């Protein structure tokens, strides 16, 4: 066997990360975000891209319409989650939220460029998911 990078094989015990994932600071941050945007729940992830990916991962695979002027990480997350991407010519969303996908019971709102007080109460229903970055 050829080892190109000469890197040792390590096993990572993910239990070691528990204090980083369930930290009181993260919980306080999530609570403050809820209070600020008017949402009932919040879940912190390391990026909005990962939130999009996780949100779409278990959904029925379909084509998702997204603005054509968007960072490439967004279509990448959609495709990696198993969906197809359809780019639309919509520049009105720039700097604002837009509906990433509307399902029967709820919608996913990509709000990576906007974070306003009471925004969730104004733009979403309790069952909706709004992604901030």
Where are these regions (language model features)?
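Conserved residues at the C-terminal ends of beta-strands
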Residues: 45, 67, 133
